[in-house]
């Protein structure tokens, strides 16, 4: 019997919506990354994007455990000497409510063209509404 290998044009993608209200950041991110990769499907193939589309609503209501609200730091660099910027999880949640989840999920996906294609299937919204009703997303409980 030959090993099955999924073909990119034969992959069936579903849409799921996750309500992140009072959920822990890492637990939501790991489940989202798992589904974006397609590892929950029996036809998972490592070199083919077999994942589903994921919509995360209420990203502003995500929580972290312990003192990570003030202690967890995010860094970025402008490219100029001395141009490093640092912000905390709390400040990032106030300014850009979905960015912490996006960064957490992106770090859990493969690096390279396949990973970049996977992260495009993630849609994060700070509030409880989203513009993807036409896709009829199924609710996914974590």
UniProtKB/Swiss-Prot annotation:
Pfam families listed in its UniProt record: Ribosomal_L13
Listed CDD domains: Ribosomal_L13
Gene3D superfamilies in the cross-refs: Ribosomal protein L13
Claim: Ribonucleoprotein is one of the keywords in the record: yes
Gene Ontology molecular function, alphabetical: mRNA binding; structural constituent of ribosome
Coiled coil: none
Keyword Transferase: no
Subunit-level organization: Part of the 50S ribosomal subunit.
Family designation: Belongs to the universal ribosomal protein uL13 family.
Protein name: Large ribosomal subunit protein uL13
Organism of provenance: Ralstonia pickettii (strain 12J)
Lineage: Bacteria, Pseudomonadati, Pseudomonadota, Betaproteobacteria, Burkholderiales
């Amino acid at each position: 019997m030959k090993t099955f290998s999924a073909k990119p044009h034969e992959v069936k993608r579903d849409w799921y919506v996750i309500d992140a209200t009072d959920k822990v950041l890492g637990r939501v991110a790991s489940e989202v990354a798992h589904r974006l990769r397609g590892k929950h499907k029996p036809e998972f193939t490592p070199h083919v994007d077999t994942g589903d589309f994921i919509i995360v609503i209420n990203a502003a209501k995500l929580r972290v455990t312990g003192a990570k609200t003030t202690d967890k730091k995010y860094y970025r660099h402008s490219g100029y000497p001395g141009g490093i910027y640092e912000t905390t999880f709390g400040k990032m949640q106030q300014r850009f409510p979905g960015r912490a989840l996006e960064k957490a999920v992106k770090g859990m996906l493969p690096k390279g063209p396949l990973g970049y294609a996977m992260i495009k299937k993630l849609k994060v919204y700070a509030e409880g509404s989203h513009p993807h009703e036409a896709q009829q997303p199924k609710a996914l409980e974590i």
